[in-house]
A protein has these predicted regions:
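Carbohydrate-associated surface elements
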Residues: 2-4
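Active-site pocket scaffolds in enzymes
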Residues: 9-142
Length: 142
C-alpha cells in the first residue's frame, strides 16, 4: 500500500482531473499499466469496518456535469482508465472510444488479500454467504 499524500498522480483526496497527460506520468505502476488500473483503500474504511453511508468515490464530467457517486460496503475500489481502448468500439451517437476514453470504478476487496493477513479477508468458507453492495448514484451538477 502506497500513501497518496505527496503523490499527485494518484492522490484523489481532493477534486482532481483524472488522467490528464497520463502518458507523461512518472509513476512506474501507471507506466506499466498504460494508465490507471489500481486499487485504492477507501477513506470510508476504518478500523476494519466500512461506512457505506458515505461517498466512497465520485467523478464528474466537466463537459456535461454528469456526476457519479459510489457507495459500497467494500474496503477498496479498483480504478481502470480504459487503457486498452483502441478506437474499435463505437458508442452512443457514433462516439468512438479511444484510449483512456472511459473510467471504471469497481468496489472490491484489495488484490492479494489472501496473502496479507492484516487486510480484510476475502475468504468464503463452506456454508457462509458473501454479501456485497455497490450503489451508483447519478446526478447532474450545474
Amino acid at each position: 500500500i502506497v500513501p497518496v499524500k505527496d503523490n499527485p498522480e494518484v492522490d484523489f483526496t481532493t477534486p482532481t482531473e483524472v488522467g490528464k497527460n497520463v502518458e507523461n506520468f512518472s509513476n512506474e505502476q501507471i507506466k506499466f499499466a498504460n494508465g490507471f488500473d489500481f486499487n485504492w483503500v477507501l477513506n470510508t474504511y476504518k478500523d476494519g469496518k466500512v461506512d457505506d453511508t458515505k461517498v466512497a468515490a465520485s467523478v464528474v464530467s466537466p463537459e456535461t456535469g454528469i456526476k457519479l457517486e459510489v457507495f459500497t460496503n467494500e474496503p477498496g475500489i479498483q480504478v481502470y482508465s480504459g487503457n486498452f481502448l483502441n478506437g474499435k468500439i463505437t458508442g452512443k451517437n457514433g462516439k468512438v472510444y479511444e484510449k483512456h476514453a472511459a473510467i471504471c470504478l469497481e468496489s472490491q476487496h484489495f488484490p492479494n488479500t489472501p496473502n496479507q493477513p492484516e487486510w480484510p479477508s476475502a475468504e468464503l468458507k463452506p456454508g457462509q454467504t458473501y454479501k456485497s453492495h455497490c450503489i451508483f448514484k447519478f446526478s447532474v451538477e450545474k
